[in-house]
Amino acid sequence: LYGNTGTHDCAPATGNPYALMSEIGTPGFGLVPDGVSEVTVTYQIAPPRTVAVNRNFFVLATTSRTAPPCGVQWLDPTGNVKGTPIGCSFLTLESPELGEYRAYVAGKLATLQAQVASLSGAIASGNLAAAKSAWLNAHLTWLEIGQDDGAYGAFGPLGGDIDGLAAGHPLGTADPGFTGLHRIEFDLWTKRNLRTAATDTVRLRQLLGQLMKAPLPTYLPATAAGIGNWLLRPHEVLEDALRDSLTADDNYGSGTDLASITADIAAVRTMLAELKPSIDPVAPHLVANASAELDSLMSAIGATRVNGAWVSVEDLPTRQREQIDADAAAAAETLAPIPDLLTSTGSNSPD
């Protein structure tokens, strides 16, 4: 597919450095092999278009479109994809947004380190109530990163050590491999043991120090796979909330699962704001719809608080719990198409 333009952003699989179509309205055209009935042209910042093939030739006339195409799929008579000779790369578009997210994560990690230091001080002072409050602040900051252990966490096993669950460890909560924020939660609420909490907080500080040693691009690389995983995260964060928090599987005594979900929502809102410029051209209503659903979820959670205190998921009336489940599921479903909308096709797709 060729056109009259000087941009070299996209090129045929042969390596010919011509753009696929003019950005100023000159028709694009191309030849296809036998058996191809239609051609779908994909764009990075506009919905795809499908045009008919006539005697192995097709024309894509556009008098007003300003988005250059960057991918082509050949379709057989049944509409199935017969081949993808050219693919779009999302690396150019999403790399700046990933950079914004990295800066956000760096700020949260710095805050988290200070909060864990405060937690350590509260434990050392023997003030259980202050230690619980400091723990909650730290835990919510971690979740606001959007990196809890199941959400395609970029921090890998280290992230699991910082905020992993006892499930999967042979000895459960007694297993030495169960470390991090939830281990300290178990110490403070279930065991009410400040001495053990102090030891486990030292370990948490070591884990955070280890995490901070490597540059963030190590964990959040601007590669096809790295960006692909990041694009999964808005949906996966809420899916984790449905699986772990709304079932109370990650409650080790604090009863703050609903507070955790508010932090998850904050993480999702941040990522949506960063991705909005890329999402809007291909799905104009997605961000607005997701934001409205997140508002409903926040309202449903807010309605559960009693005199400002958090209520455990297990203690919620059935109607309130079902409403929160439904709102979280609706938002997660709305967010699910983001990777398909923004990832690339053909030879440029993630491995």
PLM features: residue spans?
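Mature extracytoplasmic or organellar-lumen-exposed domains after removal of signal/transit peptides
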Residues: S89-D351
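Short intrinsically disordered, low-complexity coil segments enriched in acidic
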Residues: Y2-T5, I45, S89-L91
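Ser/Thr-rich low-complexity repeats and stalk/linker segments
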Residues: E23-G25, G35-C88
